[in-house]
Amino acid sequence: MPFNQDSASSIRNFKVVGSRPVRPDGVDKVTGRAKYGADLSAPGMLIGRVLRSPHAHARIKNIDTSKALAAPGVKAVATAADFGSVRRSLRDVLENCLAQDKALYEGHAVAGIAAVDVEAADAALTLIEVDYEILPHVTDVEAAMAEDAPLLRPDMITSGIHPAPTKPSNIANYLELGHGDVAKGFEAADIVVERSFKTEATHQGYIEPHACLASFAQDGSADLWCCTQGHFVVRDTCAQLCGMEVSSLRVTASEIGGGFGGKTTVFIEPVALMLSKKSGRPVKIVMDRADVFKATGPTSSTAMKVRIGVTKDGRITAGAAELCYQGGAFPGAPVEFGAMSAFACYQLENLHVSGYDVIVNRPRQAAYRAPGAPMSTFAVESVVDEIADKLGMDRIDFRLKNASRSGSQSAYGPKFGTIGLVETLEAAKAHSHYSAPLEPGQGRGVACGFWFNFGGQTSVSLNIQMDGTIGLSLGTPDIGGSRASMCLMAAEELGIPYDRVRAIIADTASLGYNDTSEGSRVTFSAGM
């Protein structure tokens, strides 16, 4: 069916939704009044700094903080020894915040210090004496999978393989997805193209570095202000790491200067809380740019193999991929998402994807714009382009011939509902840009991509004020204009002007639990 622009027109005529009003945070941001993490302050505040390992892999034999603690202006020092035992699922989080037995990557935090000013804190950092035993390191995902690779965790056995291996390795997890008979599918192909790809880790590059302010009270309760994509997750994580009741910790999200998935976890927040607890004063920590790049999570680097078979008329008979993703020094690379996304745009009867979650001496990876999907999609789409060119087919026509649609079988089990891929491809081909002549130095590319959407837990409070305005309390930090979206929807449903709705991001003590702002979920979930 050819694309019909009229079919994409609104089913319902909206009065407010679809307009372009001034964002609730717009004026404050462009005039400099908005408060970001680094703008926060408190009476009696101390400055926190973090000592980081200069080695990619080293055993920590001893940490001597006595000289630093005796230095002028120093009020507290914190190491991993200050934190108690935590449940298994949080051990890696704590170890990433402060190294325990080993430094697992260059930039791994080893100790934190709180002093009366920046100069005193920086001077005291140089007085912390760490006795390192330097160990062999590995940073490349394929090198880490080799038989003779230096092991980050000598007791780690790969999960997902049956029967389980008897020897440890740097492969944390293995998975397989797919359906059909791949061998038979490749036998039926007239052309088979197999290619290998490597992608490097890419940092989110948010403009604002991580920043927080922690303040412990004498009764054991605490306040924490930080730039984050999910302050409820920060509350739950920090409370458990610091041995607190969740209700004793209130977290407030500051304005956020970019996140892109990289601010969905904790790095300096537990350290600031511990320093505040030990010193009895508020403690503020702001990462510098070197800290951000060395110690916070980029995407995974990868090594991938993709194989696709097609008939002469352009029908894909089989697809296969091997995906090796490194998750930094801790398990958790998003290889499963990569495997689920790789061939999602194509209707394949025969499909097999294998994935390896590999640890290396790098910072722990963090989410970045559809974590895991762009890498595997890049590999598959590159092969798809090559096949289309070999067949002499238009690249969109080849994709249309094989595109997933309602009822197509996904690699991970369910069948797709209405996804609109065919309509999108038809619209792209019908657009004048696709057939416009190219000037020297110009090119034109085509690719398909896939990502999930999920609801998650969300709580919103709506109150009618005495003056007739509407107060909206949201629990999802605004990283993409969600305050404006919520105001638009509230105004639409209540039949009032947009400027009569006021939205705030509430703290964790003022609203029910909210999941993080990620995965394109907030407008969908909070708007319901």
Question: What residue ranges belong to the model's regions?
Answer:
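Structural alpha/beta core scaffold segments of enzyme domains
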Residues: M1-M528
